[in-house]
Amino acid sequence: MSKAHPPELKKFTDKKFSLKLNGGRHVQGILRGFDPFMNLVIDECVEMATSGQQKNIGMVEIRGNSIIMLEALERV
């Protein structure tokens, strides 16, 4: 059985990200940490509602299996 490898996200730590999540949710924030299952810790997180409203939700942990897409908003 192959061993799980951690995601290559170390160079993106402390950079701003946009994440598309299952359930049609979209959040933006700063990547503070991650684990081999791609669970992410996002700081200064803002939820972007489909109506255009933004809601500050602070520091959150996002499970890796709920992430559909992630995009770095800053150059590495």
UniProtKB/Swiss-Prot annotation:
Q: List locations, semicolon-separated.
A: Nucleus
Q: Name one GO biological process term.
A: mRNA splicing, via spliceosome
What keywords appear on the UniProt entry? mRNA processing, mRNA splicing, Nucleus, Ribonucleoprotein, RNA-binding, Spliceosome
Q: Which GO terms describe its cellular component?
A: catalytic step 2 spliceosome; P granule; precatalytic spliceosome; SMN-Sm protein complex; spliceosomal tri-snRNP complex; U1 snRNP; U12-type spliceosomal complex; U2 snRNP
The record's section on Gene3D superfamilies has:
2.30.30.100
The Sm domain extends over 4-76
CDD domains, A to Z = Sm_G
- SMART domains from the entry? Sm
Transmembrane helix in keyword set: no
Q: Does the keyword Signal apply?
A: no
Which PANTHER family does the protein's record reference? SMALL NUCLEAR RIBONUCLEOPROTEIN, SMALL NUCLEAR RIBONUCLEOPROTEIN G-RELATED
**Which family is annotated?**
Belongs to the snRNP Sm proteins family.
Record's function text: Associated with snRNP U1, U2, U4/U6 and U5.
- This protein's name: Putative small nuclear ribonucleoprotein G-like protein 15
The record lists the organism as: Homo sapiens
| Organism lineage | Eukaryota, Metazoa, Chordata, Craniata, Vertebrata
